[in-house]
């Protein structure tokens, strides 16, 4: 309707929300700034934004160094007694579970989780790896590393794997891009990690998973390589 009226008047439409008008942040603004995932996005956004506009208390716990607009929210720390006075708490985290003491405090609260997409995964694997094995191995790997699968932003491998069905299928399952790197690109950083003459002989570089995670994250590797019966994963984190 706003666009329709602006067309009649030959003017530029300005669409505002209640949080804009009240000079406050909003759940959707926070999620957008983090490229974040929220389950039941629309319903959660409408509910939380309505509370913010009506000056009701909504807690915000930031698990990490994420920089977001916190206006209108009650920013909490894990040792904060304010948690007890909150009915609803928005949590920003790329982890599956938080510290045990914090979980206890949040036990009876309604939790709205924003999962920033800041995790990248380097993958090496044997040719013709089964798709289910690849998917199940990654799910298990992320669970053991306490990483939320919704935090994955991108996966990558060496260019000889560009047609590897298991990795292509994984990117579709995760709904994230699959980026490939040439041996020349990988060789610029593979000296930083464990070397395998067998890998060098077969694909032209000394290793794949760690250098690819390094390249995807601009050098911010957070989990070294882990092997799963013909598959190797490594994790990097990008700065948002």
Question: What are the functions of these language-model segments?
Answer:
Residues 133-140, 150-213, 217-233, 240:
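C-terminal non-catalytic interaction/assembly regions of soluble proteins
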Residues 34, 38, 190-193:
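Solvent-exposed, flexible loop/coil residues
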